[in-house]
């Protein structure tokens, strides 16, 4: 069976470092997947950072042409991401503007968005490469940190934007506005603005609801609020959300927990819906509810 995707970028462990990343680069998985893709008629490239990690034994870095993220966006029609959800978050944000679909092979832990098991990837990928797949689009958030009327930090987020206190400081006080409307001043350890994708991450641990990916909304979740009546709020993603730091020391804004901006009193974190979306491809028959049931261990012990 010949692949409908002619130019495939192999992307792996995009932000990993240290002993685990070095072991991953040398265990032959990336090389095996690359050889499999070639057997399906694909021209294989490797993302530059993955190539540099693999250069220790030249298993991947020396066999396939390395490309920057920009070059992948311009030359490839599929990205195959090998890693965990963090790997997918990082590359998904960067490739969203190019509209390239992504397939995730899970070698992390939970794997909500890298959903193909490593031990069964060949049987799963063969029909997908031939065009038998489910397509799933995920929204992105565009966030800016505004200081004295100027943007001092700018980032995309697929999971969440989190404004929180410093590790050794007390609560922060945050002024929250949605659209043109003032919501409240909240005293808490922090506040999470989560997308549907991020509703299964930090927001879920903080007591937020699950939000189906097809819902055009965000969820606003307080972290350990001083007032117990402060509850998660579901919002339309067409509205701009503004979080202003009123009081607190060593506060910061985190974007997918992969980039961070320190905040000063009076700084405003402005979150809007991005114009870009991430395209995921899943095996035929994939269901969001199957993922929830498996990853959250629903029905365990039941009939």
Swiss-Prot record:
Q: Which Pfam families does this one have?
A: NAD_kinase, NAD_kinase_C
- Which molecular-function annotations from GO does this UniProt entry contain? ATP binding; metal ion binding; NAD binding; NAD+ kinase activity
Where does this protein reside within or beyond the cell?
A: Cytoplasm
Q: Which UniProt keywords apply?
A: ATP-binding, Cytoplasm, Kinase, NAD, NADP, Nucleotide-binding, Transferase
Where do the catalytic residues lie?
Answer: 85 (proton acceptor)
Q: Which reaction does it catalyse?
A: NAD(+) + ATP = ADP + NADP(+) + H(+)
Example GO BP: NAD metabolic process
Major place of residence = cytoplasm
Give a yes or no for keyword Kinase in this entry. yes
Which gene name belongs to this protein?
nadK
Q: What class of enzyme is it?
A: transferase
Briefly, what is this protein's role?
Involved in the regulation of the intracellular balance of NAD and NADP, and is a key enzyme in the biosynthesis of NADP. Catalyzes specifically the phosphorylation on 2'-hydroxyl of the adenosine moiety of NAD to yield NADP.
Question: Per the UniProt record, which EC number(s) apply here?
Answer: 2.7.1.23
What positions does the entry give for NAD(+) binding? Answer: 85-86, 159-160, 187, 189, 200-205, 224, 258
Q: Which cofactor does it need?
A: a divalent metal cation
Protein's UniProt name = NAD kinase
The text of the family note is:
Belongs to the NAD kinase family.
Top-level division of the source organism's lineage = Bacteria
Q: Which GO terms describe its cellular component?
A: cytoplasm
Coiled-coil annotation reads none
Gene3D superfamilies reported in the protein's UniProt record: Probable inorganic polyphosphate/atp-NAD kinase, domain 1, Probable inorganic polyphosphate/atp-NAD kinase, domain 2
